[in-house]
Amino acid sequence: MKKLLSHSIEGTNHDNEDIYNVYKNYVWVMDGAIDLFDTPSKYGFSVSQVMQTLNKVLPKECKDYRGLKDILASAISQVQAAYLSSDLTYDYSESPTFAFMFGRFIGDIFEYIYLGDCYLICSQVYIITDSSFSPFVQANREEISQLKALQVPNLEFEVKEVYKRTRHLANKPSGYHIGSLDPECAYLSNQGYFPYSGQELMFMTDGFYNMFSVFGSVSEILSELQNLHLDGSVKLDDATVVVVRGD
């Protein structure tokens, strides 16, 4: 596999929670969700630390004879052991959660697993992503819009409470599936494959895709993101893109 391009730009929070890698015939992008529960004070580590540890552990688990879900579950188990105590019970929705797109070339097939709003774009046309979280995003927007219209006091606190309630639905029966420090989340992921015939494959976190859907050009987006960072007046999400082509 040949890496044609990779770029990750930290957002306004100045603590990049995106990770990516191209390792042998494997490629992934993952997007750590914003911390809503003061993880450093509660657990002693940050979302960014957890994501970087996962990025270091995952290549060691990448064996072609193993399924992608098994590989990811094993990697998460190691990260869990590094950060969480086996003597305690955790609500994994309050520890770091993350979206992911994880794939590999096996012969003339590309196979992949994914959860959340990361994206795989084939030949700049065919888009693969998990849309199951979209209704929750829309519900959040509507509730926050109502709060603003009502001019509620302490709006920032109330908005955060909206996001917290949604986060508590992570991997719950009435909620949505997402990556977490529970290894079982890997087995909740969507999966697919397609015959590979030489096309470019683009992997993106939502921070990059949201601009790609407007500009349609990776180079234009990178330029625009740099300009927005210099301007400093716009709140930006972390944004990551990886472009690869099979051998």
Report the location of each language-model feature:
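PP2C/PPM-type serine/threonine phosphatase catalytic domain
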Residues: 1-247
